[in-house]
């Protein structure tokens, strides 16, 4: 099942309160970028982020899920995307790690 435009728009609206987030549509799903750095995506109406040291600490209670069939890289399923302070901290720290 592809991600709906409504879910995509809602996630982007929430995330843009925490940082400059953009998306790129790919095969019905969306890759997510913060300040030009790929950090996650929206897959089948699920907001997933890459595994980094920060995401492992801050999202330790969140399940790991595969973004699509055949993927070998599990990602964290994030449910607190409406919490602006939490998302700002998560994105800022993750982007620094990914850019290293």
Can you name each region flagged by the protein language model?
Residues 1-100:
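Charge-dense, helix-prone N-terminal extensions
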């Amino acid at each position: 099942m592809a991600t709906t435009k409504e879910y995509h728009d809602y996630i982007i609206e929430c995330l843009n309160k925490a940082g400059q987030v953009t998306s790129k549509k790919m095969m019905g799903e969306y890759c997510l970028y913060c300040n030009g750095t790929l950090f996650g995506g929206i897959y089948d109406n699920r907001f997933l982020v890459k595994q980094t040291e920060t995401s492992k600490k801050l999202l330790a209670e969140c399940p790991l899920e595969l973004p699509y069939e055949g993927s070998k890289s599990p990602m964290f399923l994030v449910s607190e995307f409406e919490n602006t302070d939490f998302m700002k901290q998560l994105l800022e720290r993750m982007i620094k790690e990914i850019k290293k």
